């Protein structure tokens, strides 16, 4: 099993072929490893951690919402989140007539604000409207979900970066540590063992899990 961790830049599709007439790039411009595919997608205008694997069962385990793997995002928004808005995100908001699953949300301030490289192109900035960073953890992945959730509470998303994936095995989360934009690395021997255990679980039962720490 071949498995990689990629820091996907802005403007790149989560696939290895370009779409005809599209302005977006593709993964082949950054990864030259054959026979690996994204286990869970990031929209072209989103950035961050993307796991690529040659194993179809691992793809299923990490993307099926029944298994409840927490994904954590850093979200730059227009406006300032108060506790009421954060609680709305935690409790769930209605998207396309369906309530989102309970989430984890907190306002990132001071040293907690992620030290990220500048985005290309840069995020739009308006002097009259402050921006803030939220950390949001979800256990499902509906289309444009993070953007729709923040918009529903009056905090439009400006920049979206997936920071980590929780394998729900009690070990550390897979994360962006030491991965610059556009760079990838193979999983470590220990990470590979954990992923192998994940797909070797013959019980095949969905996991309820617990919020990331």
For each predicted feature, which ranges?
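Long, low-complexity, intrinsically disordered segments
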Residues: 209-213
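RNA pseudouridine synthases
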Residues: 1-205
């Amino acid at each position: 099993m071949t498995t990689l961790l990629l820091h996907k830049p802005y403007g790149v599709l989560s696939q290895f072929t370009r779409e005809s007439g599209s302005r977006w790039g593709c993964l082949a411009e950054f990864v030259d490893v054959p026979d690996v595919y994204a286990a869970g997608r990031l929209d072209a205008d989103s950035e961050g951690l993307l796991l690529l694997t040659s194993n179809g069962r691992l793809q299923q385990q990490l993307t099926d919402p029944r298994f409840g793997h927490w994904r954590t995002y850093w979200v730059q928004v227009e406006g300032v989140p108060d506790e009421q808005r954060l609680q709305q995100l935690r409790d769930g908001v209605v998207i396309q007539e369906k309530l989102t699953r309970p989430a984890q949300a907190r306002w990132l301030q001071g040293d907690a604000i992620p030290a990220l490289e500048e985005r290309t192109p840069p995020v739009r900035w308006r002097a009259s409207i402050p921006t803030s960073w939220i950390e949001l953890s979800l256990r499902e992945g509906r289309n444009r979900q993070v953007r729709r959730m923040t918009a529903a509470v009056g905090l439009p998303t400006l920049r979206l970066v997936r920071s980590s994936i929780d394998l729900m095995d009690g070990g550390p989360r897979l994360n962006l540590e030491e991965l610059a934009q556009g760079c990838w690395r193979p999983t470590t021997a220990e990470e590979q063992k954990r992923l192998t255990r994940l797909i070797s679980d013959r019980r095949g039962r969905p996991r309820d899990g617990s919020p990331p720490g």
